[in-house]
């Protein structure tokens, strides 16, 4: 099942990949977990593994709430995700200094039909498969004023999504994930997504009168706030 949950994230947080935590010595060691199909009574996690799990879970819990923290604890404890934080760290203030807005927006057309305009170029990490991305998004049907999702300006909570985790929700689609792969933390982009990478020929209803008609072209504004980088344990 996909992992998509809402998050309230301070605007100054851009890239999180800590290296100076008291538990940092644990990050260079492999995570070995014993589990079965029924993990509750049989899963075994050593004290050292529990410390590593707590270290990753704590900041996620603070940013995304208890449920998200439990989700990551479950990933680590039960082998759903066998990953750990990278040890490198990019200073937040330096990253924000290097983020720059663009006076002139150039249209980029991708082979798959996606068009986008960079409004602000970020200087942080670029999300990859399995990475946790926190971003704000506004989506509407192209050529109309019909907005179906908007988390900017306190209108809603920022979204947090694990890359390559489906199905999508909250008005997101395959085209959004494709675009995120070439963005950096701090970046902002307007994206126009064709129906083939949106919701296709389906009529999608979100409740409260919000819906996307069949074969709709979608117009999004995306701003990447934070990228949590994880390094696969081999």
UniProtKB/Swiss-Prot annotation:
Pfam families from the UniProt entry: FKBP_C (PF00254)
Keywords (A to Z) from UniProt: Chloroplast, Isomerase, Plastid, Rotamase, Thylakoid, Transit peptide
Reaction it catalyzes: [protein]-peptidylproline (omega=180) = [protein]-peptidylproline (omega=0)
Organelle transit peptide: 1-28
Subcellular location: Plastid, Chloroplast thylakoid lumen
All copies of domain PPIase FKBP-type, residue ranges: 130-228
Cellular compartments per GO CC: chloroplast thylakoid lumen
Enzyme class: isomerase
GO molecular function: peptidyl-prolyl cis-trans isomerase activity
UniProt cross-references to InterPro entries, sorted A to Z: Chloro_FKBP-type_PPIase, PPIase_dom_sf, PPIase_FKBP_dom
Family classification: Belongs to the FKBP-type PPIase family.
Function in brief: PPIases accelerate the folding of proteins. It catalyzes the cis-trans isomerization of proline imidic peptide bonds in oligopeptides.
Descriptive protein name: Peptidyl-prolyl cis-trans isomerase FKBP17-3, chloroplastic
The species this protein was found in: Arabidopsis thaliana
UniProt lineage: Eukaryota, Viridiplantae, Streptophyta, Embryophyta, Tracheophyta
């Amino acid at each position: 099942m996909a992992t998509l949950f809402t998050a309230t994230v301070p605007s100054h947080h851009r890239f999180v990949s800590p290296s100076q935590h008291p538990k940092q010595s644990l990050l260079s060691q492999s995570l070995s977990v014993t589990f079965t199909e029924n993990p509750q009574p049989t899963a075994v996690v050593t004290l050292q593994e529990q410390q590593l799990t707590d270290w990753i879970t704590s900041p996620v819990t603070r940013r995304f709430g208890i449920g998200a923290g439990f989700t990551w604890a479950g990933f680590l404890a039960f082998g759903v995700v066998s990953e750990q934080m990278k040890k490198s760290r990019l200073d937040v203030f330096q990253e924000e200094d290097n983020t720059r807005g663009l006076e002139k927006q150039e249209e980029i057309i991708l082979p798959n039909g996606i068009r986008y305009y960079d409004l602000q170029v970020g200087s942080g990490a670029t999300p990859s498969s399995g990475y946790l991305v926190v971003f704000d998004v506004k989506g509407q049907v192209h050529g109309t004023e019909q907005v179906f999702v908007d988390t900017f300006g306190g209108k809603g909570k920022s979204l947090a999504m694990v890359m390559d985790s489906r199905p999508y929700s909250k008005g997101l689609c395959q085209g959004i994930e494709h675009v995120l792969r070439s963005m950096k933390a701090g970046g902002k982009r307007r994206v126009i997504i064709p129906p083939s990478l949106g919701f296709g020929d389906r009529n999608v209803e979100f409740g409260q009168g919000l819906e996307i008609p069949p074969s709709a072209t979608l117009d999004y504004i995306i701003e990447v706030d934070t990228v949590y980088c994880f390094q696969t344990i081999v």
